[in-house]
Amino acid sequence: MEAKGAAQWSSILVPSVQEMVKEKTITTVPPRYVRSDQDKTEVDDDFDVKIEIPIIDMKRLCSSTTMDSEVEKLDFACKEWGFFQLVNHGIDSSFLDKVKSEIQDFFNLPMEEKKKFWQRPDEIEGFGQAFVVSEDQKLDWADLFFHTVQPVELRKPHLFPKLPLPFRDTLEMYSSEVQSVAKILIAKMARALEIKPEELEKLFDDVDSVQSMRMNYYPPCPQPDQVIGLTPHSDSVGLTVLMQVNDVEGLQIKKDGKWVPVKPLPNAFIVNIGDVLEIITNGTYRSIEHRGVVNSEKERLSIATFHNVGMYKEVGPAKSLVERQKVARFKRLTMKEYNDGLFSRTLDGKAYLDALRI
């Protein structure tokens, strides 16, 4: 029986890139992974020399003496970047090291074990790739493990509850810790925007609010310039909190028409605004287009935790912002309608969000 409120979206089953790299001595990239359609936009490696990517200090954000100035910085980061690094978030670094180690162990399980967690036909959760809608579609050079974590009744019974111990308990705690961080950030955003709690905070602090996780594994590639680890896109959710699992860089964000490599700070989270928050804020806060690139020598791993509005809630521009700005820039629709449209498409920059503009 399908869990209450759950909906079925699917992605076509594809081979494991990790296994393909492990089993064969690959010197050239298989045709289905060659991305001649890749964005050839210049990569600006010196960007951080000219201007600093925003860094938000959680401790200052929560202190009565420094809150106002840090909320201003947060507001600027969300308006001008849609992206920032979060330091002093309060989650113990030794616990985060445990999360990272167990994610690596999970991807290194024997294939026979991993098959238990593989995507099933007509489902999108599990090991595999997402947004694969046709057999001739070009694929990313990556494996991912995607699953819903909250609310508990939306968990697939063959996924989260069956994860090996202690990994399952570790992820349970990580889910709770990151959710607390996300709720604080969203509350501070609402403060900066001067909008009512029910227009933003309460949408993400509700029994129906959805939290999901995607663990990403990007194997080394003999021709890294021929492939893409993660297709350029903006996140379709409200807020994303990303943690780099190992020390290999590969995340790039698009700023002022150029791809900017992100250099993660030690023990920091990378936080980005998703399309749903752009809709709710009527375009005041902007989701950011980003991609993952790979290299020829080392694997890269990360974990993204997505925070979103409940499935049958309606989303649209906050009424108080529409009244202030005299215009609604996006359509109103339920999250189910939003996701039905989303999962019928391939990833393509911010094209889906653009289709919802008025």
Swiss-Prot record:
Gene3D superfamilies from the UniProt entry: B-lactam Antibiotic, Isopenicillin N Synthase, Chain (2.60.120.330)
Protein's UniProt keywords contain Mitochondrion: no
One family name in Pfam for this protein: 2OG-FeII_Oxy
Presence of keyword Oxidoreductase: yes
Gene Ontology biological-process entries: leaf senescence
Binding site for Fe cation: 233, 235, 290
Domain Fe2OG dioxygenase: 209-309
Expression sites by tissue: Low expression in roots and leaves.
Keywords, in A-Z order: Iron, Metal-binding, Oxidoreductase
GO molecular function, one term: metal ion binding
Induction pattern: By virus infection.
Similarity field: Belongs to the iron/ascorbate-dependent oxidoreductase family.
Miscellaneous: Unlike the homologous protein NCS1 of Coptis japonica, SRG1 has no norcoclaurine synthase activity.
Name the record gives this protein: Protein SRG1
Lineage per the UniProt record: Eukaryota, Viridiplantae, Streptophyta, Embryophyta, Tracheophyta
Name of encoding gene: SRG1
